[in-house]
């Protein structure tokens, strides 16, 4: 936003000024490189998807919101291994309730959620997690993290109960520390150590903790809701690369984002949600943003 409004832009990184530029003489790519300290690719690099067997099939799904109002109205969709399916739309059109139903956080009123042939519509979040379904929630503070716990405790939230991190309910603290520190380095979580409470981190680094925990578990299906919210541009690039790599390794990814650019760049197919329904399926390579804007407003003809 600064780029479009300001005459001059000062870039700071790690507490130091990296450069002062006239916006009329500087590209967004140059500013991004100064922000990160290396070359940044703003376009997502990926090959054509090669979808195979169906992982998730949602049939006639109805979901009510916390007020008892219908938020998801007869949604049908499928996701195959080896593809990224995106959901686009103005926030408040049922995306939140759809994700909550898929992850067991909200009970569906009607319909089926078939995961590898099993209906998980009535499953608890705990059981869904144990089926190798990862979830990056849109609200990291209230849903994605326990801010009263340490960084390492949040990082092992999906794996604390199994080997090699624990055996018969007893932590192997050496292996826990090794695991947490590896994720800290791999995902560039900026903190002196993993023993600090996660609430001491910036919002962007808190998001990195969530992403690190979810993407490090080799999930079969990843449900990513606003996965890059509050993250710096270099780590946005890294998260996009990780989602594409998961696809290329045979995983299935559902990407829900309020950032239209993100959905269009990362997803292989995009469903547009409007008033609780998926009103249009598109190939992001075959539509432009003006067309998407009309679809997001409910204009499909």
Placement of each model-derived feature along the sequence:
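Glycine-rich phosphate-binding loops of nucleotide-dependent enzymes
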Residues: 1-301
């Amino acid at each position: 936003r600064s780029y479009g409004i300001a005459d001059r832009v000062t870039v700071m990184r790690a507490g130091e000024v990296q450069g002062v530029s006239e916006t009329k003489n500087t590209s967004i790519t140059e500013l991004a490189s100064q922000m990160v300290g290396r070359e940044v690719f703003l376009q997502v690099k990926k090959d054509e998807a090669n979808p195979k067997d169906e992982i998730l099939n949602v049939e006639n799904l109805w979901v009510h919101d916390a007020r008892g109002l219908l938020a998801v109205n007869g949604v049908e969709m499928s996701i195959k291994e080896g593809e990224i399916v995106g959901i686009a739309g103005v926030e408040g059109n049922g995306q939140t309730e759809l994700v909550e139903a898929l992850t067991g956080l909200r009970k569906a009123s009607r319909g089926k959620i078939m995961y590898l042939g099993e209906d998980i519509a009535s499953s608890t979040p705990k059981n869904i997690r144990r089926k190798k379904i990862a979830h990056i929630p849109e609200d990291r503070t209230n849903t994605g993290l326990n801010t009263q716990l340490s960084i390492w405790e949040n990082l092992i939230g999906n794996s604390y109960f199994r080997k090699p991190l624990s055996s018969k309910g007893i932590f192997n603290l050496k292996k826990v520390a090794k695991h947490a520190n590896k994720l800290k380095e791999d995902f560039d979580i900026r903190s002196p150590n993993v023993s600090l409470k996660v609430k001491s981190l910036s919002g962007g680094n808190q998001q990195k903790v969530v992403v690190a925990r979810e993407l490090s578990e080799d999930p079969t299906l990843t449900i990513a809701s606003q996965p890059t919210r509050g993250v710096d541009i270099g780590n946005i690039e890294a998260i996009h690369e990780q989602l594409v790599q998961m696809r290329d390794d045979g995983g299935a990814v559902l990407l829900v984002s309020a950032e239209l650019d993100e959905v269009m760049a990362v997803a292989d197919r995009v469903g547009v949600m409007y008033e609780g329904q998926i009103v249009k399926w598109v190939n992001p390579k075959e539509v432009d943003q003006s067309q998407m804007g009309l679809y997001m407003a409910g204009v499909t003809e």
